[in-house]
Amino acid sequence: MQQLVRAGARAWLRPRGCRGLSALTEEAVQSAEKPEPLANAGPQAPVLRRCELPVPLHRRPVQAWVESLRGYEQERVGLTELHPDVFSTAPRLDILHQVAIWQKNFKRISYAKTKTRAEVRGGGRKPWQQKGSGRARHGSIRSPIWRGGGVAHGPRGPTSYYYMLPMKVRVQGLKVALTVKLAQDDLHIVDSLELPTTDPQYLMELARYRRWGDSVLFVDLEHEDMPQNVVAATSGLKTFNLIPAIGLNVHSMLKHQTLVLTLPTVAFLEEKLLWHDSRYTPLYPFRLPYRDFP
């Protein structure tokens, strides 16, 4: 009780111009709620696509520019939001290496084959007698230590190098590849793959003007929906390739210097890749897997 009386007396004796700590705190909160407008704030670019899938509370969507292929100067036509769990993951280069090596080897079959001493023609007769000649004993001229003989412990093809990585590792490899491409400014998003002409020279000059490098991979949602102009323009170029979104892989992304995605492709990749983060283990045979697959 005495402490309350003393505090009230101090507040009553405080000069009129002094403000208490509570008043300063209230003013600070009010100033934080009303930010000052920027003096040089220009017109904001339109956001052409919002991130529709839920984003974790501790993360924010990544914004990227949307470009157009219809002209040299139409480099930025708006913004798009990218999901951080797909385009801003941890750069696990070890997983990227595992997926790249697996993709090269899981279809590999080695047909190398050598003949053993039983398969080489000849050598059925003993070259000389066992004793008395002074030379080393031999039973066949097709022994592995003879010239023209069989091979010991040689390859016996065809040999399959097939093995399967877990699905989680393969999905993470795609996420890491997309993240690295975006971080290195080698990932570009366009509104569509429409070109004003079918001339391959226009596509090469456009890539040179925007500094895309010598090899570019264009990804659209479906192969049937790709514009005819870009199909005709890339048909005569070896380093400019088209691929549907369902066929996008780590090897193709690492092989090309620049990756170009359309807006529907971005939505498709986010939906497919994020589904694996919350998928359940099937309790029924694998012939009917994952009925909730998007």
From Swiss-Prot:
Alphabetical keyword list: Methylation, Mitochondrion, Ribonucleoprotein, Ribosomal protein
Record organism: Bos taurus
GO aspect biological process, one term: translation
Subunit structure: Component of the mitochondrial ribosome large subunit (39S) which comprises a 16S rRNA and about 50 distinct proteins. Interacts with MIEF1 upstream open reading frame protein.
GO cellular component, one term: mitochondrial inner membrane
Main location: mitochondrion
UniProt protein name: Large ribosomal subunit protein uL4m
Keyword Mitochondrion: yes
